[in-house]
Curated annotation (Swiss-Prot):
Chain residues that bind Mn(2+): D489, M490, D491, D632, I633
Signal peptide bounds: 1-24
The protein's name: Amine oxidase [copper-containing] gamma 2
Species the sequence originates in: Arabidopsis thaliana (Mouse-ear cress)
2',4',5'-topaquinone: modified positions: Y423
UniProt-annotated location(s): Secreted, Extracellular space, Apoplast
Amino acid sequence: MVELSFSQLLVLLLSLLFLFTTLASSSKTPRFKYSLEKPHHPLDPLTTPEIKRVQTILSGHDPGFGSGSTIIHAMALDEPDKQRVIRWKKGDRLPPRRAEILAMSNGESHVLTVDLKSGRVVSDLVNPTFGYPILTMKDIIAVSQVPYKSVEFNRSIEARGIPFSGLICITPFAGWYGPDEEGRRVIKIQCFSKQDTVNFYMRPIEGLYLTVDMDKLEIIKIVDNGPVPVPKSTGTEYRYGFLNETVYMDRVNPMSMEQPDGPSFQVEDGYLVKWANWKFHIKPDQRAGMIISQATVRDSKTGEARSVMYKGFASELFVPNMDPGEGWYSKAYMDAGEFGLGPSSMPLVPLNDCPRNAYYIDGFFASPEGIPILQPNMICLFERYAGDTSWRHSEILLPGVDIRESRAKVTLVARMACSVGNYDYIFDWEFQMDGVIRVTVAASGMLMVKGTAYENVEDLGEKEDDSGPLISENVIGVVHDHFISFHLDMDIDGSANNSFVKVHLEKQRLPPGESRRKSYLKVKKYVAKTEKDAQIKMSLYDPYEFHLVNPNRLSRLGNPAGYKLVPGGNAASLLDHDDPPQMRGAFTNNQIWVTRYNRSEQWAGGLLMYQSRGEDTLQVWSDRDRSIENKDIVLWYTLGFHHVPCQEDFPVMPTIASSFELKPVNFFESNPVLGISPFFEKDLPVC
């Protein structure tokens, strides 16, 4: 029998994944086939030839890249200088192409910059900050095999009566909890039973936890608090073809939005999107999942293309679980910085994730060995019409005049979904013809649950578990938070001269006898001078609007052109600031931040997130208190929600969503969608 090495097994697994995902995507699905062998825009992601060239250059720089002792953890375009990108026009020569690589070699973190034209490594920073790069699939697969090498672990499993054939140990978590965990990459894992179910997340093997040295692949510590009943597999199935339950619900007929003339948007050169009055660049990203760049909107009155946002993306996704017990205290995930939203993305499912007439974009990332890996159907673009109204008015006070004006609201959605372990997240960037950009994050998938001996709340008595409610027999849904920090480099009619304005709604009391009213609201505006002026904690009883304006671009009435942030889901972190997870997730100390533009400040939790200590976070940058008035500035908003689980979240959660908007404020001279055409029956298909 031929024995395969771990590396051969990994390559085989990746090859099978490639084959599966390629076959899973419909041949009729409009998609970008990656036939391009060269980039067309300064912000285009690395092409497959470029990824291969980077691997060749790195092998020459460090023989370890060829032997496998040096591992690539992330590779992406090192974007050109912002002003150079802004000045670039189609037909111009592209700026020099560079790649940024996060790698590990001999236990040290490397941040390398490679010049693709010269073939040189122009920078190699070793351990620039405390922490390690994003995990690789190779890391996760290797760690999942470590428990079986331990006699102590195997005895613990046997004592619990769990068959090894039904065992799976693939949910890693780390964090940072003191100096005893420093100096090496540490990971903590818990195992589950997949016997009689694919939903192993609902069958945790509670009370048994392992700490592993990732580089030596050795167990550092085993904690065995004694057996806890493993929840039964009954009721854990969620796949449509395997559900045997009777559903007492009237069938809803299939539906889709028909477009007889095809979609209204265009995708040029793979990544440049044009729709209605919008134009923007979109690309897959290993860490952020999806990046929107150079979003411009055309003024419907003048035809001028005006800049709105240079770059927007999900910077970090922080999920702290609220159980301080052994084995649980470190389950506080930084999904973007520790796992990556790009590699966690799975192919979007046509007709269910994205509607008919959607257009799909693939992603390409580098494997630990520097080999291009395909992420098919990673992003989809589609037009949405859900029966909403863009604007309307009917008039009844003019005799003999029949006025019933209404316009349908059609939007363009860019969507990416990722499955980061048990949780699934759907990210939407939705562009509206009135200039609004709405960003929505939806969550589904499986809860992170805890095993318990109790099957009914009556069994608990006064021993109710503080970590969460009972959601099924022997299953506790652990309370947790979701915080998604967005990096929003807003460039309102230019990049070098924006300001952040806090518009305060202040209650004014009237003296007796002046009016029959006793109070009213008055608006006062405050221009933030420095970064600390723009550290905002939301409060319902101290309301503000938050505007980004260009004081040098005035409307005909003298108002500065601007956009405002319309917050949606707001939740404050209740953790102490010196709690280790909160130190790393310090960007949740406020809901809104504004910083001076710095191309190195992109990741709210820091560049090297894994086992970081909170020394390179948005909080640290903002506390430098740089001037932000009439400067190139970046808006940061953290969308958040607390999640107290319930029975409806079992075995898989119905999708919950939260959003925020970026909305024009005196940006246009009047309603920009006044002149859009209504729909008429004659223009629609008869189905």
